[in-house]
């Protein structure tokens, strides 16, 4: 099994992703394959990375892409169509994130999986089937750094240069940092406190007089 590097959650605006690509071939790879149901009992997501594709990896006895030493440190996942279908478990993108995946490129994605990825800072891009196949069949894909430019919607390496497709709303959220709800709330702490203090029922809670704010 590949050693997983120390987890660092993405925060704030994201404009580029640079890293090696890892290829996972197959249509309709569902969330139960990404993270089997028995791992959903966890109280947090911290250790899900080591269990990603657990059953598939066991069946392939060390030959699964997520077990190959050549894919160590990879952060851009290349998939086929309807990736992330099945149940809506948010554990699936969380497991990928904690393994080290920071972006996914594929033919298509299940809608709920796509939204769950966006919510934790994993941008998902689409490409036509032919171009995805070209990337997946490139024997040098594991040996060179690739760069995704979210603003320009491009995917570049020493071997190819493709224009990616991403929803404009998703693109804007990554570039502005609005995908990161926690950081957005923390950055606007004073505005939130002011809004709370302006609410009549919060003033009521601060007073012993029942009708003070009326």
Model-assigned labels for residue ranges:
Residues 1-214:
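Fe-S-dependent hydro-lyases/dehydratases of central metabolism
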């Amino acid at each position: 099994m590949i050693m997983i590097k120390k987890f660092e959650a993405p925060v704030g605006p994201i404009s580029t992703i640079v890293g090696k690509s890892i290829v996972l071939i197959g249509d309709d790879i569902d969330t139960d394959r990404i993270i089997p149901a028995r791992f959903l009992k966890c109280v947090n997501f911290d250790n899900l990375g080591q269990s990603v594709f657990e059953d598939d990896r066991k069946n392939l006895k060390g030959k699964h892409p997520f077990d190959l030493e050549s894919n160590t440190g990879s952060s851009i996942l290349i998939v086929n169509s309807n990736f992330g279908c099945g149940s809506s478990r948010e554990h699936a993108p969380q497991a990928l994130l904690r393994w080290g995946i920071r972006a996914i490129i594929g033919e298509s994605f299940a809608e709920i999986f796509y939204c769950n990825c966006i919510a934790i800072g994993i941008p998902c891009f689409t490409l036509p089937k032919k171009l995805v196949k070209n990337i997946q069949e490139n024997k040098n894909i594991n040996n060179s750094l690739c760069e995704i430019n979210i603003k320009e919607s491009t995917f570049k390496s020493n071997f190819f240069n493709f224009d990616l497709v991403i929803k404009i709303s998703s693109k804007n959220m990554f570039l502005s940092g609005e995908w990161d709800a926690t950081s957005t709330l923390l950055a606007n702490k004073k505005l939130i406190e002011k809004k709370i203090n302006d609410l009549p029922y919060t003033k009521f809670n601060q007073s012993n007089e029942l009708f003070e704010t009326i």
